[in-house]
Amino acid sequence: MSDRWISLVAIDPAKERCELDFSAGQRDVVADTNLVYLRHLDAWSKKWDNGRIEIKDNLQFSKLVYGSLYYILISLPSDSTYLPTNQFFGLSPGGLANGANFTDYQGHVFWDMETWMYPGILMLHPELAKAMLSYRLFSMPAARERAVAGGYDGIRYPWEGGSTGAEVTPDICIPCRENQQHITGDIAFAARQYVSATRDLQWLQTEMGYEFIREMAAFWVSRAEEDWNNDTMMYNINGVMPPDEYQISINNSVYTNIGAKLSIMFAEYAACLAGTAEDNAMIEKWRHVAENIYVPFSEFKRYHPEFEGFEDVTGDRKIIKQADAILTGFPQMWSMPEDVRRNDLELYEKITDHGGPAMTWGMFSIGWLELGDKNKAREFFHKSYSPYVREPFKVWTEAQSGIGAVNFITGMGGFLQTVLFGYGGVRLRVEKLEFDPEIIPGTSGMRLVGLDYLGNSLNIDVYEEVIKIVKTKASEHTIDLVTSDSKIKFILHSGKIFLLNNV
């Protein structure tokens, strides 16, 4: 017979109220130890019913998926409190529990939150994704100071952020602090995803959402103007560190530059949604800069060099730390021919450090799924989690060797993206939601419970031959179902089951 351990924690800014809450909890335990446990179960059941991923006929893999989502959710604000919630200060790579001096990234917030943890949460728990973005809105004054200090317009976010939103990257990595400017593009892309998934006009119009988007675009416009090239008649973004941190300072990172272009382009779209009348001259300036930011591309080899001059690099500098240029295919979803996508994957697979972080291999898996190569996708999918998970509690480590950040929720977020956007086939576009699922090897299918889009919730069951879709919650936004082999639109009504061939 196993023992049941009950742990009570009360957290409140007011000591007296905190003590009262803790005493009330103690009384409940004394009165009925099962009562607290049942309340705990009920709270988590409601959370899971709002959004989860079920794996069919593979218990161990189910535990891994549930565990990954659980560890991220417990680091996010509670949705059932007796008091108004305080400002949320973001997710660190090691979650809320980790962050000692010079270990586990000291609890600081990086691009990890928006790029790796946020996308899966947005599709399953959009209210929590909004809370994640709220940290960046809260820290806009500090981001504005960061931009002004560099001589730029708008807002520039720090590589490592803390409770004030100021730059807190330690001196052990000054190049990271100064050169990893892509984080502002990453945050802008997260805002783009939020608007695409929710059409939250209140957030855009009255909660500073549009200002947030506009000011990030303003930073990129001024940043690109600094490096205008009269010879090529293109805007450059020089002196940056890309996601591949083995490159300290390079020019025209393909990932950074595409992030900048997308940020500026979306600002005009967001202005229309928000009903904001921007100056025509400003709009024209945005368009000119966005259209003319240089994107490295080899016409001869038909692939995206990681940065300008990449093809001339030799020796150790040719080794890539982690996924970089392949991120242009996903999550950035930059339009490219199939052969270019394939060439990017094949080239960078050969030169990526095989001891790198888990997220890298998940992005390769997603890429190969896009191209229909199930064997390659399976190979990289297995590599994206197997070496990083520690039993028995499914705790992840940053490195395969077990060192680095512990309970590495960044890796868990990347893994969940491979499940949801890779095998789930979900693609969140600005004007539509697409999905083209595949069966995860070793399972008989999956179920997406509470997939949220425009205020509607969907349950989607994916089997080998059939896909079942049910709308479980409706909003003022009606959503139509259009299959790839038909131009006929089916209006999704609540409770009505749609069965589709999964071929």
Spans of model-derived segments:
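Acidic/polar, glycine-enriched structural segments that form the non-catalytic walls/loops
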Residues: 1-104, 498-503
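Non-catalytic C-terminal accessory modules of carbohydrate-active enzymes
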Residues: 172, 375-503
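Alpha-helical packing segments of well-folded alpha/beta enzyme cores
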Residues: 7, 40, 64, 71, ...
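Active-site core of glycosidic bond-cleaving carbohydrate-active enzymes
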Residues: 106, 111-138, 189, 207, ...
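The feature captures the catalytic groove of carbohydrate-active enzymes
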Residues: 4-6, 13, 17, 93-109, ...
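A ubiquitous short alpha-helical element
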Residues: 26-33, 174-179, 249, 348
